[in-house]
Amino acid sequence: MRLCLIPQNTGTPQRVLPPVVWSPPSRKKPMLSACNSMMFGHLSPVRIPHLRGKFNLQLPSLDEQVIPARLPKMEVRAEEPKEATEVKDQVETQGQEDNKRGPCSNGEAASTSSLLETQGNLTSSWYNPRPLEGNVHLKSLIEKNQTDKAQVHAVSFYSKDHEVASSHSPAGGILSFGKPDPLPTVLPAPVPGCSLWPEKAALKVLGKDHLPSSPGLLMVGEDMQPKDPAALGSSRSSPSRAASHSSHKRKLSEPPLQLQPTPPLQLKWDRDEGPPPAKFPCLSPEALLVSQASQREGRLQQGNMCKNMRVLSRTSKFRRLRELLRRRKKRRQGRCGSSHL
């Protein structure tokens, strides 16, 4: 008899052990409870119904998703350069000096005004930077500074260079634009921070009739232009390239050397026949006999030398064998004599 413990979970509160009942084991099959049926029992297949309805997904359009981006506002402050103030001071001092000297003629004034206007337009077009997208006030300030610079530069250039005082000039020591300078003088250095490209452009636009005829003034733009090192290197290397190109052209222009055709071989015999036998030097019969005899003697001597070597080798071998045999006999005789004694 076996006693099994069967717990009774019905009606027991939590944290309290159920009472133990001792009873004999039953032969009946254990019954599956509702809790254990999911673990030990067979699972029935679950059927999922098919979806019969249709769903329409509404996606937002691309135009609605576009978000306008705001550009940041850029504030640029333009500072007046120090060069403008310095140039203004120079212009004022030069204007006072011109007033002291005296007024010029109407023709000279008209020519100078036209030249200054063209020069100012050229310099303003040359110094005009890229347009800035910003305040209108900033653009106006930049344009004013540029025009002031251009006018000041033109006035300083023509007041210093075109009105050169000399003792040979007839009217008050000032040369007009139409008359040539008898003694060309050294021109002063240009204003710092300004290039001479506008002067060159003015020379091309106005022509030779409206400009002074002095050679020194005409050569200012070409002499005072800044030369780049790359341009200098190319100018130095250009003569060598030109020389090599000309030599290459000469080589190409020369006609190619024509190879002369080689004459065909002139055979002294027919093609079917072979070449004639080689010619030996003519010798007398006595000389032939002597040469043959010398050859025979040489052969005999060589043969005799070989025979002698063979004989010597054989004789040396025989002599060695004889000596060995004699030594053995002596040893045997000595042993036999000692045994008899």
Swiss-Prot record:
Please list the residue ranges that the record marks as compositionally biased, kind Low complexity.
Answer: 234-245
Q: Please, which domain of life does this record's source organism belong to?
A: Eukaryota
Output compositional bias ranges, type Basic and acidic residues.
75-101
| Record region (Disordered) | 75-115, 216-278
InterPro entries noted in UniProt? POM121-like_prot_1
**One Pfam entry name:** POM121
Protein family membership: Belongs to the UPF0607 family.
The name of this protein is Putative UPF0607 protein ENSP00000383783
